[in-house]
Amino acid sequence: MSLSKKLTLDKLDVRGKRVIMRVDFNVPMKKNQITNNQRIKASIPSIKYCLDNGAKAVVLMSHLGRPDGVPMPDKYSLQPVAAELKSLLGKDVLFLKDCVGAEVENACANPAPGSVILLENLRFHVEEEGKGQDPSGKKIKAEPDKIEGFRASLSKLGDVYVNDAFGTAHRAHSSMVGVNLPHKASGFLMKKELDYFAKALENPVRPFLAILGGAKVADKIQLIKNMLDKVNEMIIGGGMAYTFLKVLNNMEIGASLFDEEGAKIVKDIMTKAQKNGVRITFPVDFVTADKFDENAQVGKATVASGIPPGWMGLDCGPESNKNHAQVVAQARLIVWNGPLGVFEWDAFAKGTKALMDEIVKATSKGCITIIGGGDTATCCAKWNTEDKVSHVSTGGGASLELLEGKILPGVEALSNM
């Protein structure tokens, strides 16, 4: 699957056409009020481009929350999003109370030129995800012919299809892969994601550094193995470093995280790194705690001293930070996925914050820096560095699967150039 050869919105003829666009309006809500409109704001350039280039209408579809295939308009309706969209676009948005069916098809058949239409939550229908559960908790499964009907109805709502929902690209849901139109393009958000991941995965400048943090080795095996085929350098930190250090250095790790499953493949990983000539940097010192608590008593340890029984490592220490700074300074391309410590708590945030500062510095000197979604993106928001790195991915699961070398169904479904 080539990321850089997919049809993009700027190459799509939208004049006089109805554009059906899959967006990600899965925004946080409190009592039907949107608490963060970032995802809605992010979709505006793609919507505006269609309108400015003479599209007859833009029909928007999205999911919100996890209604599991059951209509829950009181809890998960997209209606509040229509109001927010209206204020951001400065024009009326027609909200429809469903996303498929005869009424919706009629409303979208011949809309007034320049219309913006928002459909109700896709996941009110079990046919979107293929499975769900009813209010009693019983599992429900969509019937194949109903899935086909659902997809056929969505396909009637537009003449061309645009997908701007990278965060859901790793899911083979109906709205991601089932709209049957001849031209299927990525929107500008999706395009930016694909452009940056193509830079890392298809044609990397070197030296290329991957920084991998997070808790469990087992969760990151596929990621580590795939990246070892691509990179020159790797930093392994976070909770999973303790498993490596215990296996490789026989380090005493006290009550730190230890991953039994992951421990079995540590030696394989090191053999592969050696074979590929990849240098892996591990932490050499640690900030420790006497319990997993924000206000725990804080101590310090090194690989040589070990971590005493009952204590746990929750961050890397100053020597590790110096080592990381040296490795980062040499790189021309960096992909970072996973924090180096419990960054949510100030006492254990220094390692991740020090690394972030070095990444920002490297970016200002021309290094390409890509932050995988999820917790690492949260770090960027916390320290206000989103515009000080090259790219912060909007998709945690989707970016992880790309870096693992998997094919994303939502990207594969797009037309090739």
From Swiss-Prot:
A Pfam family of this chain: PGK
Residues bound to (2R)-3-phosphoglycerate: V23, D24, F25, N26, Q38, R39, S62, H63, G65, R66, L122, R123, H170, R171
Record carries keyword Acetylation: yes
Ranges that cross the membrane: none
Entry binding sites for CDP: G214, D219, G238, G338, F343
PROSITE patterns: PGLYCERATE_KINASE (PS00111)
Binding of ADP, residues: G214, G238, F343
Reactions performed catalytically: (2R)-3-phosphoglycerate + ATP = (2R)-3-phospho-glyceroyl phosphate + ADP
Binding site for ATP: A215, K220, G239, G313, E344, D375, T376
Enzyme class: transferase
Pathway: Carbohydrate degradation; glycolysis; pyruvate from D-glyceraldehyde 3-phosphate: step 2/5
Residues the record lists as N6-acetyllysine modifications: K11, K48, K75, K86, K97, K131, K146, K199, K267, K291
Location of Phosphotyrosine modifications: Y196
Entry binding sites for Mg(2+): A215, A218, D219, D375
Any GO MF annotation of the entry: ATP binding
Positions bound to AMP: A215, K216, K220, G239, G313, E344
Predominant location: cytoplasm
Keywords of this entry: Acetylation, ATP-binding, Cytoplasm, Glycolysis, Kinase, Magnesium, Metal-binding, Nucleotide-binding, Phosphoprotein, Transferase
Positions bearing N-acetylserine: S2
Gene Ontology CC terms: cytosol; extracellular exosome; sperm fibrous sheath
UniProt family annotation: Belongs to the phosphoglycerate kinase family.
Function in brief: Essential for sperm motility and male fertility but is not required for the completion of spermatogenesis.
Subunit record text: Monomer.
Protein name, as recorded: Phosphoglycerate kinase 2
Organism: Macaca fascicularis
Gene: PGK2
